[in-house]
Amino acid sequence: MVIFLMASFSVLSLAQLPNHLREYPLADRKASGDLVAPIFNGWTPNADGSVTMLFGFANRNRKEIVDIPLGPNNFIEPAQFDGAQPTHFPVYNRGGFIGINERGAFAVTVPADMAGTEVVWTIKNAGYEYSVPGRATSTTYEMSDGERALGTLAPAIRFERDGPESTSREGIRADRVTTSVGNPVTLSAYIQDRGNRADYPEQSKLLFYPLTTDWVMHQGPVAPDFERSLVLDIDREAEGVTQLGAEDWIHVETRATFSEPGSYIIRLRVSNFAAPDSRFDNMCCWSNAYVPVTVTQ
């Protein structure tokens, strides 16, 4: 009798749920036609009283790469923050549920005179609609850009050897690059591990660790073909590329070939997850930079 009542209650409870919630989260992931969810990763206070909010996403499809243009199906409110978000949502599989997440894909800064403002990102796709509010109200979501336990810091990125530097998820933007359909264009940057590990010689084998670089389309009509878009830290180490001092910079590049004209933004993500006090998920340990590209016919 108890089992029957529990089963009946479960069926009734399920029947009361909206259709899109009956499948989630216990249903298997689909190859295609599944949801893309916006995710609020956390916030960082700034010295001037402003707040930087970090967002990522999860594409639950096992195979389908989803593109959602900016507009009624992919927007941020208040409108002044709209446009920073990605339109291209690759499939990630880094193990476990959290492994499908792409964390810290972009960030927005809420000025001090807008303190308390919620920044809401909405995505509509495949019959699903999800909105996530970014709030700087809970210390649970507050993040630090300070050193990790053994001195690791977010890597540095520059587009010119002596140019502006990114050490954050909000990142910097390169000068716009122009190319044409089918004509490969070189995208390049300088990267550096900023770790301060001299005080931890017994725990940290190296003062500076090889970095991982990943070039990915952030916005655009169709993803370009990249020549070696992802270079892992272990690949870089095997090639003999190491950093011996705090002044050393590594030049990295890829070649991108676009098949359709339009306006694009390419994101470069640089991470130092090889360090012993760093791992994927740690917001400390990667930085973003963005390259706007115009592709003509």
Where are each of the predicted segments found?
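Sec/Tat signal peptide C-region and signal peptidase I cleavage site
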Residues: V11-A15
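Extracellular/lumenal mature domains of secreted and surface-exposed proteins
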Residues: L17-Y24, K30-N46, F57-N59, D67-P72, ...
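Short, well-ordered beta-strand segments enriched in hydrophobic/aromatic residues
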Residues: V51-F57
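Short, acidic Gly/Pro/Ser/Thr-rich loop/turn segments
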Residues: R62
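Acidic, aromatic-enriched beta-alpha/helix-loop junctions
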Residues: V66-R103
